[in-house]
């Protein structure tokens, strides 16, 4: 079973190198870890990690995306494989972009889906209350920590995890992550489209993080910007992994809508265009 490889910055001199068909994680204070690359679906790096270029090219060769998150979760970088072929799905998606009616259909569907997810989040937080999703932003603002820097740090970290899963999903489908419908002409436009729809789930996981016991051991606010501790990163990853069945279901629903708009005759459309 393929899994996500998470690597977190440490005071120890951790090095990541290739060893045959496996990635070798060398830790001076622990036994070396060897992970066959065929068991890795994506790699997420928090902070600074020494990693050899052989690892980067091996990941690209296996269509495995690499996501890097800065120490303070202020920047996200995504390294993708370089595709020499132009999948038929990409052409179908471009046809959707050129069809204003189909593009509008997807945009309206995305807004409705996002509104439904907002309602679901409100119901989880206040199960006995009859609150409209029109009050969603006020509710989230009320429940946020007073220190907004803490919120941004956690939310950006979650956004990176969601982006990593979405990017992996799109690559596996042969869809261009940059070919956005809502976020046109934007880097990773289609990833942003997915993330726009799924943002209420990010809010919910962020709120749950701040309900954790001993929150002061999870995030440091004695310096700006705020910094997640190793324990805090572990908390966020566990929460994300435990709710992946929901996240993957949402990803699948968005994919189904895209396929509905693109149609199913990929080979026919491709041959006509070529």
Role assignments for model-derived ranges:
Residues 1-35:
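N- or domain-start disorder-to-order transition segments that initiate the globular core
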Residues 23, 39-40, 142:
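General secondary-structure edge motif
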Residues 15, 24-26, 33, 43, ...:
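Residues in flexible loops and secondary-structure boundaries
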């Amino acid at each position: 079973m393929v899994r996500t490889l998470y690597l977190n910055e440490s005071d120890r001199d951790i090095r990541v190198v290739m060893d045959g068909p496996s990635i070798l994680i060398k830790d001076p204070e622990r036994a070396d870890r060897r992970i066959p690359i065929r068991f890795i679906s994506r790699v997420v790096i928090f902070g600074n990690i020494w990693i050899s270029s052989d690892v980067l090219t091996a990941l690209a060769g296996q269509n495995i995306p690499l996501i890097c998150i800065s120490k303070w979760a202020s920047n996200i970088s995504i390294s993708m494989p370089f595709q020499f072929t132009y999948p038929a799905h990409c052409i179908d998606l471009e046809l959707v972009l050129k069809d204003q009616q189909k593009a509008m259909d997807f945009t309206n569907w995305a807004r409705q889906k996002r509104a439904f997810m907002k309602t679901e989040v409100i119901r989880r937080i206040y199960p006995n209350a009859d609150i409209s999703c029109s009050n969603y932003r006020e509710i989230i603002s009320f429940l946020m920590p007073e220190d907004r820097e803490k919120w941004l740090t956690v939310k950006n970290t979650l956004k990176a995890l969601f982006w990593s899963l979405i990017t992996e999903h799109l690559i596996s489908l042969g869809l261009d992550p940059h070919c956005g419908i809502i976020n046109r002409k934007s880097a990773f436009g289609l990833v942003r489209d997915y993330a726009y729809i799924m943002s209420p789930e990010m809010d919910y996981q962020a709120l749950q993080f701040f309900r954790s016991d001993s929150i002061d051991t999870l995030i440091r606010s004695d310096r700006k910007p705020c910094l997640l501790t190793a324990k805090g990163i572990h908390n966020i990853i566990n929460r994300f992994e435990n709710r992946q069945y929901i996240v993957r279901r949402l990803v699948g629903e968005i994919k189904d809508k895209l396929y509905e708009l693109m149609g199913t005759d990929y080979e026919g459309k491709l041959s006509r265009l070529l």
